[in-house]
């Protein structure tokens, strides 16, 4: 019977005790010597039974040489027990909860039965156990004292008598603890406390503490430093008596006590890092050992950090040989090729097994050897199982079948190409090598359009290249990692590659209708020349004579007809911004391709550019595959570049110069801006700037200046009037999307304008309000605050240049500081989501725990989507009926069809209007991403038909309607299988919802009125194609969607954080782009959030269209504390007098007059008799009171209600201009008395505390609402005619701060439309499902247009809320979601602490996910390894055919 094999299903962690060490140890260390002569000393710490790292001797245990021996542990029998340094806290817990006399528990175990196992002992030990009586032996439990100076020493305080607990005594105490007690306190039998005190410690194998000896005998030697620690440990152990007996309370000799302490310290240093470098001869506590100039190494020190065993050796990628060099561009290479220097090709070797079919091909390599390229370096002989150097072979050496030849790399080999950081899976791609024969070349070369995969450029970037060795790995690499697989981005669902820069401009120049010289035409020979380097089948030019002229559109059409598609879209070239200043040819303002022929328009970035979703290459990829799309990119690139080389294209300084008239006009515009800025300065100096609610005068002034100094759109007019768009290279680059933007063009030609850093102008950094030393003190002109009047072409002055450099310096610092944070955030996301894998039901689960019932809620792969428009969404009821209701045949079926279309439209509107109401910036649109573009399929079918328009009859129309209806009904069975479809088993609701959007589109595009000219056979073909594409768009089984989500979110989020400065210049973010993402992914509570907001809709429809009323409501909910209304305050110590004429402080003598008036006007508010000598005098800010609409009466009423132990007097509200409103608050004696009615010795502190309470008193508003402003919203509503109308006159309240519950209590706020950006606040009020949706919307809001596909956001949200609580992507969140996956948590961070906790809890770690199998040395079950393959080796052996037998059969 043959023995089978099995995979490791789980790993259990336990505390290793004496028995475990003795069972694993192969020998006992008794002496500290290393060698005796030339061999290891027997019984020494380098005993040959523990392994070998020396080629002079073998391992005695396994009889292997140093390369094959894995090492074997030994043991050191201690003369006195030692505590386990990793579990000191656990030892203390046990000492607190068990009787030191009998080992019985002194706590009631039933009190902790309801707790989970790991919490029981911790909770029991945290209670009061001192002085308790043991239930068994009735002994009083003493107080356990942890020595504050010595980490390893415990003391017991028994009724004033203090004794030291030596490890031997602790071991005896723990030996009395029963297994039943251990289990009831939540620990495993394998984690008995007796194992926490060791009599035998393990000595690690030789292989992990190697030594080097050069020569034999007295030659130079070098051994690992940890051997010195072990030597010290053995020597100190020998100094202690063998049979040392210690009795509790007994005094032992001082030298023995010191030796015991030193041994414990040495064992600690052996396992863990030293915290200090003090010598072991003096001091106490955690003392360290110094080896030379550095602390001694430890075993656990090898685990953490990037250079540790876990991240570097176990999780890190390792290859035998790799090459690295700088990259440069080469447009002659295909996108899937890489140019490889010949010097590299002769260094890297490829192992290839000699077979009958390749021996003739390999023979030249064998004969060339190392002398000539291509050659080889060595041969592995199968018969002798030995490796031979090619230069040392004998004359009669033969290359035979089965040998392995290590040959040079040649053109056509596949290789991995990688650029770090590898933020996406496309960062590692497989290319075909093209060996560069020129020996002077030493850089890697690649097509410029291939840079997008690696986010690379040619400014000195370096990349790695390595060649897979085996045939299996080469085939696997090409199938799984070929760059064609990365053509469609998982992140954005659009194409990654396309034309860039030169080829984009070339495509435009080739396809435009006219040139400055006239028609854009060429003769036959020139057209043929363009195709020379495209490496495609050349088009037929036989029908053209040498004198015939071809335009660029015809030439491009010859190429596009090889992959016929249909395309129609406005090009980037046409812009409404440029239309007033230039003449557009009517044939160039709309690009249209019909069945592969470019009818009109030009090819620019929107059609052929990199990342153009819905562009030409995207359509080709969807219909013909990504490989064909890559070929078309290369071919188009060659056409464009060849044309540019012939026709010429350049950018010169002449393209950047303005005419004198245009320059004068630009200066007039700049002077207008400066004049407006000066007027704002004058308003500031005269005090005429009145800031709105929520802004200070300075902030509002800066905001006015920024708005005033922005270049208006009309500055483009002089630029456009001074250039010729048909010949200006700079403008053509910008207009076609090849490079640059309008602001770049303005900065180069007209002026740079205001420099901003963090949404602010340059602020004064020097004394006396100076931004730079070039400007006078307290200068207010715009130039002193970073406004640059000159353009780059005109040149900058010294201060202007410095302002520009300040902006660049801020970018550099911001990037440097953010890189580490974003890198760690990316790593946390990868580890947090890596266990999420798609199973056979297209569910996403972590091992067996469900995360998503269906991946992405629709089961679709983000790479298999297209953008389409739903025609019915924006139509009114009447428009829908006119366009989609078929009235040619009177049948209830068509009434049913129209009713279904109307219900689909209303359902779509309902869903996305709800999303619009609960998202700050996501408006309803009729454009969505779906897996199948039905309209394109219908158009392609009709264009490929040769029968023309056929007459239609009633029977065929009804049959087609029935076909579509049945197809839509059965579409969800795509998620199940054909058997269930034939049986018509019930479809789960979530699968019906998954296909609902696709069914809506099918019913729209295949409505009866749109398919009258389609035959039943064509309809059948259309439905088959839809089903095929829909099935191919489903996510694959075993896909690691968690990692895909982490990569797709982390990469653009990293870019977002690095670009936060640029975003803030445009007013898009706060001062730091990293704050909000950290708040979202860290699941911070409400009180810890810095940037929370609320959007509040008003309940009354009439009020929400009136800005004034909305502002009044905003004022009423904004939290106003008394401190915000005060100009200044004073705490006075004075004696109150009824005559009011002896006010202590002369500066406030004028208060006597209004105080007298107050008493006369308020006869019922006379001062009480118990007024104290403390008075708080406050001056109110009348401006703030007016802006906040707060009356003095409301302030006084609020203060009297909140502070009854005071007497309040105030001046009148309507004071003259310049005279403040004054409030005097006299404290009463009752405020200074305790419950004993005795006066406090000092009352100054009480008075100061009263001031703090007073200033923080709430006058009005909702707690948590720091600021409230009125904003204008744009929302959609359905009118009575069913028309989707856009309303842009709605006012809502946007708050800084959040309090959903408080806002719901306000009668003016609509409680059903309250939106808060706070995930925690949403969770508290609405529950976990609302929090999940809030995570999605907040990530989308933060990342904006650069955000990834929403399926990745769903992955984040579902994982963070899977447990019923919002968990973070930090270490704590991973512990909550996957508490049993010890190996994963250990790989993330703090491996020593994680392993210690796992051993204490006896954790069982199931092997699943990616990190855990990798650490165990197995292959994770993902991708193609997700499915098990069963192979009948016996059948294969019996039916094996040799080459000769196959030839005979042939």
Swiss-Prot record:
Q: How does the annotation summarize its subunit structure?
A: Part of the viral DNA-directed RNA polymerase that consists of 8 polII-like subunits (RPB1, RPB2, RPB3, RPB5, RPB6, RPB7, RPB9, RPB10), a capping enzyme and a termination factor.
Name the UniProt key words of this record, in alphabetical order: DNA-directed RNA polymerase, Nucleotidyltransferase, Transcription, Transferase, Viral transcription, Virion
| Any one annotated GO CC term | DNA-directed RNA polymerase complex
Q: What is the protein's known function?
A: Catalytic component of the DNA-directed RNA polymerase (RNAP) that catalyzes the transcription in the cytoplasm of viral DNA into RNA using the four ribonucleoside triphosphates as substrates. Forms the polymerase active center together with RPB2. Part of the core element with the central large cleft, the clamp element that moves to open and close the cleft and the jaws that are thought to grab the incoming DNA template.
What Pfam families does the database record attribute to this sequence? RNA_pol_Rpb1_1, RNA_pol_Rpb1_2, RNA_pol_Rpb1_3, RNA_pol_Rpb1_4, RNA_pol_Rpb1_5, RNA_pol_Rpb1_7
Keyword presence, Phosphoprotein? no
The family note in this entry says: Belongs to the RNA polymerase beta' chain family.
Q: What is its main location?
A: virion
Summarize the record's induction comment.
Expressed in the late phase of the viral replicative cycle.
Task: Give a GO biological-process term.
Answer: DNA-templated transcription
The name of this protein is DNA-directed RNA polymerase RPB1 homolog
Q: Name one GO molecular function term.
A: DNA binding
* EC number, UniProt record: 2.7.7.6
Q: State where the protein is found.
A: Virion
What catalytic reaction does the record list?
RNA(n) + a ribonucleoside 5'-triphosphate = RNA(n+1) + diphosphate
Recorded source organism is African swine fever virus (isolate Tick/Malawi/Lil 20-1/1983)
Write out the domain note: Lacks the typical C-terminal domain (CTD).
């Amino acid at each position: 019977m043959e023995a089978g094999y099995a995979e490791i299903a789980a790993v259990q962690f336990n505390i290793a005790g004496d028995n475990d060490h003795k069972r694993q140890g192969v020998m006992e260390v008794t002496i500290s010597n290393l060698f005796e002569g030339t061999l290891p000393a027997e019984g020494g710490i380098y005993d040959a039974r523990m392994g070998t790292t020396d080629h002079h001797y073998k391992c005695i245990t396994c009889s292997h040489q140093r390369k094959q021996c894995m090492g074997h542990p030994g043991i050191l029998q201690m003369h006195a027990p030692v505590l386990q340094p990793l579990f000191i806290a656990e030892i203390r817990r046990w000492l607190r909860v068990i009787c030191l006399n009998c080992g019985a528990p002194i706590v009631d175990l039933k009190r902790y039965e309801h707790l989970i196992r790991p919490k029981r002992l911790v909770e029991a030990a945290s209670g009061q156990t001192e002085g308790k009586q043991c239930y068994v032996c009735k002994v009083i439990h003493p107080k356990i004292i942890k020595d504050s100076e010595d980490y390893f020493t415990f003391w017991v305080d028994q009724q004033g008598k203090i004794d030291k607990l030596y490890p031997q005594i602790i071991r005896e105490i723990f030996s009395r603890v029963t297994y039943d007690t251990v289990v009831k306190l939540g620990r495993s039998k394998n984690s008995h406390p007796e194992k926490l005190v060791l009599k035998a410690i393990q000595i690690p194998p030789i292989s992990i503490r190697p030594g080097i000896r050069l020569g034999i005998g007295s030659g130079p030697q070098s051994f690992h430093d940890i051997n010195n620690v072990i030597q010290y440990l053995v020597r100190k152990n020998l100094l202690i008596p063998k049979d040392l007996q210690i009795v509790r309370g007994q005094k032992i000799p001082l030298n023995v006590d010191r030796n015991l302490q030193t041994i414990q310290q040495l064992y600690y240093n052996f396992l863990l890092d030293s915290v200090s470098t003090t010598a072991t001869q003096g001091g106490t506590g955690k003392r360290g050992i110094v080896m030379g100039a550095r602390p001694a190494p430890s075993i656990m020190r090898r685990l953490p950090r990037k250079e540790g065993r876990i991240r570097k050796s176990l999780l890190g990628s390792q290859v035998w040989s790799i090459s690295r060099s700088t990259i440069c561009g080469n447009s002659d290479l295909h996108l899937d090729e890489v140019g490889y220097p010949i010097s590299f090709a002769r260094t890297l070797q490829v192992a290839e097994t000699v077979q009958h079919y390749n021996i003739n091909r390999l023979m030249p390599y064998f004969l060339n050897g190392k002398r000539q390229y291509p050659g080889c370096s060595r041969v592995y002989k199968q018969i002798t199982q030995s490796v031979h150097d090619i230069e040392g072979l004998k004359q009669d050496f033969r290359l035979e079948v089965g040998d392995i030849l290590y040959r040079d790399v040649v053109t056509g080999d596949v290789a991995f190409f990688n650029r770090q950081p590898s933020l996406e899976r496309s960062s590692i791609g497989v290319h075909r090598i093209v060996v560069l024969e020129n020996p002077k070349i030493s850089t890697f070369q690649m097509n410029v359009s291939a840079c997008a995969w690696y986010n690379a450029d040619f400014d000195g970037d370096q990349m790695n290249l390595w060649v897979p060795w085996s045939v299996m790995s080469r085939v696997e690499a090409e199938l799984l990692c070929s760059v064609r697989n990365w053509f469609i981005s998982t992140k954005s669902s659009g194409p990654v590659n396309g034309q860039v820069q030169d080829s984009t401009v070339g495509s435009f120049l080739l396809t435009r209708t006219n040139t400055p010289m006239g028609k854009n035409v060429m003769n036959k020979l020139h057209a043929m020349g363009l195709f020379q380097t495209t490496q495609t089948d050349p088009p037929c030019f036989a029908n053209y004579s040498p004198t015939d002229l071809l335009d660029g559109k015809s030439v491009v059409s010859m190429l596009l007809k090889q992959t016929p598609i249909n395309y129609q879209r406005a090009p980037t070239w046409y812009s409404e911004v440029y239309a007033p200043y230039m003449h557009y040819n009517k044939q160039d303002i709309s690009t249209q391709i019909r069945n592969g022929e470019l009818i009109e328009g030009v090819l620019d970035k929107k059609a052929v550019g990199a990342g153009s979703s819905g562009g030409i290459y995207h359509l080709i990829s969807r219909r013909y595959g990504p490989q064909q799309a890559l070929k078309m990119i290369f071919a188009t690139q060659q056409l464009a570049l060849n044309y540019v080389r012939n026709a010429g294209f350049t950018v010169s300084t002449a393209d950047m110069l303005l005419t004198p008239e245009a320059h004068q006009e630009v200066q007039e515009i700049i002077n207008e801006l400066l004049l407006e800025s000066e007027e704002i300065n004058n308003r500031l100096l005269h005090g005429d700037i009145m800031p709105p609610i929520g802004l200070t005068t300075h902030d509002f002034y800066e905001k006015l200046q920024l708005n005033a100094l922005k270049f208006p759109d009309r500055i483009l007019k002089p630029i456009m009037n001074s250039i010729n768009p048909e010949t200006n290279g700079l403008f053509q680059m910008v207009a076609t999307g090849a490079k640059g933007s309008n602001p770049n063009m303005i900065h180069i030609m007209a002026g740079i304008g205001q420099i901003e850093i963090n949404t602010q102008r340059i602020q004064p950094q020097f004394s006396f309000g100076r931004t730079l030393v070039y400007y006078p003190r307290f200068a207010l002109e715009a130039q002193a605050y970073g406004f640059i009047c000159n353009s780059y072409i005109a040149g900058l002055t010294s201060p202007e240049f410095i302002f520009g450099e300040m902006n660049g310096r801020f970018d550099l610092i911001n990037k440097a500081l953010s890189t580490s944070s974003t890198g760690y955030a990316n790593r946390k996301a990868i580890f947090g989501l890596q266990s999420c894998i798609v199973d056979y039901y297209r569910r996403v689960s972590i091992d067996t725990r469900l995360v998503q019932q269906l991946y992405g809620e629709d089961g679709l792969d983000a790479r298999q989507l297209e953008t389409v428009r739903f025609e019915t969404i924006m139509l009114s009821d009447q428009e829908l009926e006119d366009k989609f209701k078929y009235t040619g045949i009177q049948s209830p079926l068509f009434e049913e069809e129209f009713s279904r279309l109307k219900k689909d439209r209303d359902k779509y509107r309902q869903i996305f209007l709800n999303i619009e109401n609960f998202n700050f910036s996501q408006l309803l649109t009729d454009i969505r991403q779906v897996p199948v573009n039905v309209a394109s399929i219908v158009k392609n079918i009709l264009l490929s038909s040769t029968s023309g328009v056929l007459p239609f009859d009633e029977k065929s129309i009804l049959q087609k309607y029935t076909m579509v209806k049945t197809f839509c009904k059965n579409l969800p069975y795509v998620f199940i299988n054909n058997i269930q479809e034939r049986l018509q088993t019930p479809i789960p609701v979530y699968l019906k919802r998954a296909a609902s959007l696709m069914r809506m589109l099918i019913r729209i595009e295949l409505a009866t009125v749109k398919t009258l000219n389609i035959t039943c056979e064509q309809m059948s073909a259309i439905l088959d194609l839809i089903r095929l594409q829909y099935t191919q768009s489903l996510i694959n089984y075993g896909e690691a969607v968690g990692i895909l989500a982490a990569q797709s979110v982390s990469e653009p989020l990293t870019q977002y954080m690095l670009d936060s400065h640029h975003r803030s210049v445009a007013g898009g973010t706060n001062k730091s782009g990293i704050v909000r993402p950290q708040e979202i992914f860290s699941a911070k509570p409400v009180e810890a959030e810095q940037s929370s907001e609320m959007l509040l809709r008003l309940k009354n429809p009439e009020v929400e269209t009136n800005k004034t009323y909305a502002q009044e409501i905003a004022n009423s909910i904004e939290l106003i504390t008394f401190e915000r209304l005060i100009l200044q305050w004073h705490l006075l110590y004075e004696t109150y007098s009824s005559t009011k004429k002896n006010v202590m402080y002369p500066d406030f003598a004028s208060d006597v007059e209004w105080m007298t008036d107050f008493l006369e006007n308020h006869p019922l508010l006379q001062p009480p008799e118990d007024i104290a000598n403390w008075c708080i005098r406050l001056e109110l800010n009348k401006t703030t009171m007016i802006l906040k609409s707060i009356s003095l009466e409301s302030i006084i009423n609020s203060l009297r209600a909140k502070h009854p132990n005071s007497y309040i007097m105030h001046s009148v509200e309507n004071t003259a201009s310049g005279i403040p409103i004054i409030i005097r608050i006299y404290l009463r004696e009752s405020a200074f008395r305790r419950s004993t009615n005795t006066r406090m010795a000092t009352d100054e502190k009480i008075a100061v505390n009263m001031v703090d309470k007073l200033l923080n008193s709430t006058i009005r508003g909702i707690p948590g609402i720091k600021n409230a402003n009125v904003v204008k919203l744009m929302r959609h509503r359905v009118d009575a005619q069913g028309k989707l109308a856009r309303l842009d006159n709605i006012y809502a309240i946007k708050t800084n701060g959040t309090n959903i519950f408080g806002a719901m209590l306000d009668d003016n706020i609509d409680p059903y439309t309250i939106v808060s950006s706070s995930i925690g606040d949403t969770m508290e009020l609405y529950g976990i499902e609302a929090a999940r949706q809030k995570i999605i919307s907040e990530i989308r809001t933060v990342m904006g247009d650069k955000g990834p596909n929403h399926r990745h956001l769903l992955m984040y949200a579902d994982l963070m809320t899977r447990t019923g609580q919002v968990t973070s992507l930090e270490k704590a969140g991973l512990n909550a979601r996957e508490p049993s996956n010890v190996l994963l948590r250990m790989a993330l961070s703090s491996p020593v602490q994680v392993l210690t906790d796992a051993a204490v809890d006896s954790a069982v770690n199931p092997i699943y996910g990616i990190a855990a199998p990798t650490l165990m040395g197995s292959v994770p079950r993902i991708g193609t390894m997700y499915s098990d393959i069963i192979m009948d080796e016996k059948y294969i052996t019996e039916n094996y055919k040799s080459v000769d037998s196959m030839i005979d059969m042939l």
